[in-house]
Amino acid sequence: MQVSVETTQGLERRVTVTVPADTIDSEVKRLLKEEYRHRRVNGFRKGKIPPNVLQKLFGREARSRAASSIMQSKYFEAVMQEKLNPAGAPAIEPKVNEPGKDLEFTATFEVYPEVEVQNLDKVKVEKPAVEVTEKDVDNMLETLQKQHADWKEVKRKSKKGDRVTMDFVGSIDGEEFEGGKADDFALELGEGRMIPGFEDQIKGIKAGEEKTIEVTFPEDYHAENLKGKEAQFVVTAKKVEARDLPELNDEFVALFGVKEGGVEALKEEVRKNMERELKNAVKAKVKEQVLKGIVENNDVELPKSMIDQEIDQLRKQAAQRFGGNVEQMPDLPAELFEEQAKERVKVGLLLGEVIRGNELKADDEKVDEIIATAASAYEDPQEVVEYYKSNNDMMQQVRNLALEEQAIEFVLEKASVKDKKASFDDIMNPKQQ
């Protein structure tokens, strides 16, 4: 077998392979003898078809099969021989495939780039210094109360936290516009669902009152015809309701499966859940900064085949997110996902090199810690732990996650890390800040 390698452009390689004629001719004869002679052919008994008849009837098909099989196997041999590291599937094309002649084919593919991770000391990370306070726990309990509250009609003016049911008609320059009208629309004041200024002017309204309010649509509003436009809404309040919060007592506590210890036991359970969620959120924020830092401080040539694969994955995820059948939905344009795909590929290559270059191995304690953290959210943690450990696929996912965390920790040891004081809401509810 003769092999030559050509760099066509960037990471693309074209391998030309020549296989001796007797190799493919022998495979064709084998196929004809072992498989095709058992075919049914009029005038011949099964298994008794002469070689010349087999060659005439099935020679072309047998040669095509033999060539396909040999090209695949010889491609892998050539890649190993030349110490190439393909980043995607090859495009294999036969050049010479005739009886009695050497089989010649080309395989075109991209190779993984040479990756060197540098400038880790230039990676800057602000690590949130935060803990769950008593006030945070009380706020969470109040949120739970609100989720289980009843709405009761009140006869006073509306205020923040109330729910106002209204009819409204919107107009611009005296003309009603599409989407600007609603009946029996329920709005909780303080949620920020409406355009700026709308809720503020609803506060203080009473049931039965009609009011005209003036607002300006934001410049980045989704409807092109409304961007930056001044509008008037005639609002008729039909009902004002206030939340009737349930008392913090044993009956309320029982809603959350707490059987003993009353309110204090619920508070402790809430605190534990908040601390677990906060720990994960802090870890995610740190990871985001680390990945951004290594991407910004390292250049890597990206294989197009890897970017295309990542685009396909992102496209499928988008279709699933919107509840569509991936096969039935039309292809979303690749451009929508290209930048995200490039970043994912670059992150994968850089983190992979951190792991490979520093000979990191999945730490058993780290693996157990990840499983224990995941299991702690369930009623029977031990059952979840046993499920993980009995499932090879799940364990491999956890080992990969552990390796990723260890790579992040390795970078953090070299990076410039500063603590930044923060509150629970800063981390968990940043949009509300």
From Swiss-Prot:
Q: Cellular location of this protein?
A: Cytoplasm
- Pfam families assigned: FKBP_C, Trigger_C, Trigger_N
Known catalysed reaction(s)? Answer: [protein]-peptidylproline (omega=180) = [protein]-peptidylproline (omega=0)
Describe the location of the PPIase FKBP-type domain by residue ranges.
161-246
Q: InterPro entries from the xrefs?
A: PPIase_dom_sf, PPIase_FKBP_dom, Trig_fac, Trigger_fac_C, Trigger_fac_C_sf, Trigger_fac_ribosome-bd_bac, Trigger_fac_ribosome-bd_sf, Trigger_fact/SurA_dom_sf
PROSITE patterns from the UniProt entry: FKBP_PPIASE
Gene Ontology MF term list: peptidyl-prolyl cis-trans isomerase activity; protein folding chaperone; ribosome binding
Q: What is its EC number?
A: 5.2.1.8
Among the GO biological process terms of this entry, one is: cell division
Q: Which UniProt keywords apply?
A: Cell cycle, Cell division, Chaperone, Cytoplasm, Isomerase, Rotamase
Please indicate which superkingdom the organism of origin belongs to.
Answer: Bacteria
- GO cellular component: a single term: cytoplasm
What does the function comment of this entry state? Answer: Involved in protein export. Acts as a chaperone by maintaining the newly synthesized protein in an open conformation. Functions as a peptidyl-prolyl cis-trans isomerase.
Q: What is known of its domains?
A: Consists of 3 domains; the N-terminus binds the ribosome, the middle domain has PPIase activity, while the C-terminus has intrinsic chaperone activity on its own.
**Family per UniProt?**
Belongs to the FKBP-type PPIase family. Tig subfamily.
Name of the molecule in the record: Trigger factor
Q: Which organism is it from?
A: Idiomarina loihiensis (strain ATCC BAA-735 / DSM 15497 / L2-TR)
Its lineage reads:
Bacteria, Pseudomonadati, Pseudomonadota, Gammaproteobacteria, Alteromonadales
